[in-house]
Amino acid sequence: MVQSKTNTKGWVRYMRVLVACEESQVVTIELRRLGHEAYSCDLMECSGGHPEWHIQGDCLPLINGYCGFYTCDGLFHEVGSKWDMLIAFPPCTYLTAASAVRLRPGGILDPGRYEQLLDAACFLRLFFLLIVIELRLKILFR
């Protein structure tokens, strides 16, 4: 396990990083190459070839750190503090303006796509709500 280390200027050089909503592991692999302890997390299996760095499941219980999880290779990992960095790729397939065009093909609302849009928006709202709550608690209890 890589420990967080600082250089002579006090900057963190090696970090614990959660890359949420990433099944491809492109970012996770690059962060690992740079020496960081990075984990990808997605509801789907990873396609990047490193199950030892992938958490298959919901990222919401993990985003504030202080958690334990199993990677896809079956090993248990524990994060005893906050993540040093959080990177997230929410499901933009249903959240972008470009996706709105596909919401009403032929002028008729696609109920399946609309439901996926609502699910993605709810997930994104919960994701940011958890981060905001964490920041407010940090300010309150300084």
Predicted regions span which residues?
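Conserved active-site and SAM-binding loop architecture
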Residues: 1-142
